[in-house]
């Protein structure tokens, strides 16, 4: 347990130095306060145990559906009505509480539901999206492979048409929710035209096997898996009709990269808030840590970075609402915010001294979890190359 006087460490301070909250509509403010209350009242006191045990937090995940927080801004019947700003605020607050919950939401809504919403048939949307928004059903998104992460465009999983079905063979890795999913969006290369296409593989389909990847030091309370696909037979009606090339897959990923920027912001705010509270209460040499000049300088530097991250997120939400969010812009936001979050969390952990490595003091869990956010949906290196190609006109991938 946290030492006396620090039991509330991790609860929101409402850090907003530039008064950005004043821009929120009543609906956006409701999503913010609803998610914040859930995190402060239900998540913080139990999530450290789930994380330490590497146990999936089913009760908390179910609450996401009950509270109407799963939708990622999808304008589809059955999903809670929210704009991109509201979706970002939800992701920010969940990640402030825990990276595993933020990651679950990113997979469930940002990847699996979004792929079905963007590329699925009306029947597929009606069947899956409502139950997934309520978390009555769980989804997964299988793109990354054992030998293809950053170069997933070269994926080797294949699909061939055979009568009234498709037969899929291959392997996937680092697939969130894959061991518990009711439906998995699998991306595979059509052997006939060599284009990448999307398929819905349902729970219990013969030939589908998923095994949890153990020994993780990040986002431990959600499960990623290795998938083996051996002659997995998928009926024709389970192919996503709008997913006919890797570009269609990429359209889904644009939105998730902006979500990663919000996730990183949540982690950074958690670190800054904890460091500020701790610096005010912790006494050394007869006075609070915050009375030392060097500590104040570090806190102000952290606040400046958090505020810049907030401004990034506000702008990408505005662009997304207007239908103008470019892949390069989302990539730059992810690159910037994940990089800054890592720096802020390292500072926060250091300011907490020895207590900074204890789970009850919150920061070390966020410091570990930001490593996953920094890596998935396109590493910093890949985002740099994407933006670099855009501003110079020269590709430097190889």
Task: Please describe what each predicted stretch is.
Residues 2-21, 89-90, 111, 352-398:
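Glycine-rich phosphate/cofactor-binding loops in nucleotide/flavin-utilizing enzymes
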Residues 157-160:
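A structural signal for short hydrophobic beta-strand segments in well-ordered beta-sheet cores
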Residues 20-24, 209-307, 373, 382, ...:
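Glycine-rich beta->alpha junctions and the first turn(s) of the following alpha-helix
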Residues 135-143:
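A short, Trp-centered hydrophobic/proline-enriched beta-strand micro-motif
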Residues 66-136, 176-183, 320-323, 365:
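Internal helix-loop-helix
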Residues 169-210:
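A short core secondary-structure module
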């Amino acid at each position: 347990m946290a030492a006396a006087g620090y039991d509330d460490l991790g609860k929101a301070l409402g850090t907003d130095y530039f008064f950005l909250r004043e821009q929120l509509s009543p609906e956006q403010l409701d999503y913010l306060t609803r998610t914040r209350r859930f995190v402060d009242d239900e998540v913080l006191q139990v999530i450290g145990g789930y994380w330490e045990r590497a146990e999936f937090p089913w009760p908390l995940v179910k609450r996401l559906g009950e509270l109407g927080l799963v939708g990622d801004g999808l304008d589809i019947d059955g999903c809670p009505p929210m704009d991109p700003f509201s979706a970002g605020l939800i992701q920010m607050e969940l990640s402030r509480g825990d990276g595993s919950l933020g990651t679950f939401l990113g997979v469930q809504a940002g990847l699996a539901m979004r792929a079905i919403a963007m590329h699925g048939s009306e029947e597929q949307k009606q069947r899956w999206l409502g139950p997934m928004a309520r978390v009555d059903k769980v989804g997964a998104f299988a793109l990354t492979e054992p030998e293809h992460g950053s170069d997933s465009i070269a994926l080797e999983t294949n699909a061939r048409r055979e009568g009234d079905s498709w037969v899929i063979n291959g392997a996937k890795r680092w697939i969130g929710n894959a061991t518990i999913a009711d439906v998995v969006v699998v991306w595979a290369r059509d052997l006939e035209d060599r284009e990448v296409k999307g398929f819905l593989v349902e729970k219990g389909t013969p030939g589908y096997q998923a095994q949890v990847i153990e020994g993780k030091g990040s986002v431990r309370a959600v499960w990623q898996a290795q998938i083996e696909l051996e002659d997995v037979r998928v009926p024709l009606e389970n192919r996503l009709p709008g997913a006919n090339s890797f570009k269609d897959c990429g359209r889904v990923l644009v939105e998730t990269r902006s979500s990663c920027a919000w996730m990183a912001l949540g982690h950074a705010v958690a670190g800054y808030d904890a460091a500020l509270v701790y610096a005010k209460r912790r006494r050394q040499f007869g006075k609070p840590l915050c009375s030392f000049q060097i500590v104040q300088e570090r806190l102000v530097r952290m606040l400046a970075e958090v505020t810049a991250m907030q401004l990034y997120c506000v702008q990408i939400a505005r662009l997304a609402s207007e239908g103008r969010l470019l892949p390069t812009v989302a990539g730059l936001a992810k690159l910037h915010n994940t990089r800054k979050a890592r720096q802020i969390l390292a500072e926060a952990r250091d300011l907490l001294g020895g207590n900074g490595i204890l789970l009850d003091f919150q920061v070390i869990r966020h410091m570990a979890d930001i490593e996953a956010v920094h890596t998935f949906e396109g590493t910093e290196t890949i985002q740099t190359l994407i933006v670099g190609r855009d501003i110079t006109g020269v590709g430097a991938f190889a």
